[in-house]
């Protein structure tokens, strides 16, 4: 009889970390229904709601990110880090996992560092084309490092690297509706080209400001439709601007899209930040995309993610600082060019790694079973 598996998955902060983590957990349960999985996140962050919604238990750490612009503010962060490591030690001691998995985000650092110090095997998932400081440090003790881009041996020991790709939300491929039905679910016409605008689960200031400034252009181009996810922080000001602009039947605005399968099915082109999780979804679904990387991320990794696609003619890149001047023209010209859309779709499809969650789950189970 197989011994029960006990696995910790740690990370979060944004949907880009949470959705892959849940996909890995689901894949583990599919392979080993007896497995017990405990998530460790950051108190007050998105994962504390989204993980229980997915059916898993989560414990929060009192962790916060470093302020890279105001170093003097990090005294309290260091105190929270020490408290988080102490709490992580208690969690690991009580739960007794055979393996700890880090998916990125505030909580993964103290959790995996503590797990390694306590002799628990660790696996890290590096989503980006440029490894972050935390994962480079955690890699020293990690048993396996799952990556999504070639050339990651410049950051990690080559013998630990496993090319898996990034897991995506599982309902994207299982529940993809027909395009006309998807458009009708957003109160849009089934026979018009449609652009989907997303800025990540928290929203993107530059993209929202650009679209807000372009409401007159959106009204003029009523042969093109727009599905716009603003993020919860920007939703009130965006909806106020939309109301002031008058009737816009070709525009659907929401703070958060729950059914992303429908949003992708409805769209001919996507405007997005360049988070690794989002890019993996675009690859899997063959979606033409205009990427506007966030400049406010560690090591400018989103720009590096975007350029990895641009080098393969698999995406269009607009700098954040140039978005307000260029983004709408680029998007409108691209969505009107069927040949360009086809080229982008074919090239991004070549980069897809469709079974990522299952491959990572198999590696996690292998490590856990080796401990039994």
From Swiss-Prot:
Top-tier EC class: transferase
Keyword Cell wall biogenesis/degradation annotated: yes
Principal location class: membrane
Pathway involvement of the protein, from the record: Cell wall biogenesis; peptidoglycan biosynthesis
InterPro entries: GlcNAc_MurG, Glyco_trans_28_C, GlycoTrans_28_N
Reactions that this protein is recorded to catalyse: di-trans,octa-cis-undecaprenyl diphospho-N-acetyl-alpha-D-muramoyl-L-alanyl-D-glutamyl-meso-2,6-diaminopimeloyl-D-alanyl-D-alanine + UDP-N-acetyl-alpha-D-glucosamine = di-trans,octa-cis-undecaprenyl diphospho-[N-acetyl-alpha-D-glucosaminyl-(1->4)]-N-acetyl-alpha-D-muramoyl-L-alanyl-D-glutamyl-meso-2,6-diaminopimeloyl-D-alanyl-D-alanine + UDP + H(+)
GO molecular function annotation: glycosyltransferase activity; UDP-N-acetyl-D-glucosamine:N-acetylmuramoyl-L-alanyl-D-glutamyl-meso-2,6-diaminopimelyl-D-alanyl-D-alanine-diphosphoundecaprenol 4-beta-N-acetylglucosaminlytransferase activity; undecaprenyldiphospho-muramoylpentapeptide beta-N-acetylglucosaminyltransferase activity
Topological relation to the membrane, as annotated: Peripheral membrane protein
EC number: 2.4.1.227
Recorded superkingdom: Bacteria
Gene Ontology CC: one annotated term: plasma membrane
Residues binding UDP-N-acetyl-alpha-D-glucosamine: 14-16, 128, 169, 201, 257, 302
Subcellular localization(s) per the UniProt record: Cell inner membrane
Any matching Pfam family: Glyco_tran_28_C
Keywords from the UniProt entry: Cell cycle, Cell division, Cell inner membrane, Cell membrane, Cell shape, Cell wall biogenesis/degradation, Glycosyltransferase, Membrane, Peptidoglycan synthesis, Transferase
One Gene Ontology term from the biological process aspect of the record: cell division
Homology family: Belongs to the glycosyltransferase 28 family. MurG subfamily.
Protein function: Cell wall formation. Catalyzes the transfer of a GlcNAc subunit on undecaprenyl-pyrophosphoryl-MurNAc-pentapeptide (lipid intermediate I) to form undecaprenyl-pyrophosphoryl-MurNAc-(pentapeptide)GlcNAc (lipid intermediate II).
PANTHER family xref list: GLYCOSYLTRANSFERASE, UDP-N-ACETYLGLUCOSAMINE--N-ACETYLMURAMYL-(PENTAPEPTIDE) PYROPHOSPHORYL-UNDECAPRENOL N-ACETYLGLUCOSAMINE TRANSFERASE 1
Record's protein name: UDP-N-acetylglucosamine--N-acetylmuramyl-(pentapeptide) pyrophosphoryl-undecaprenol N-acetylglucosamine transferase
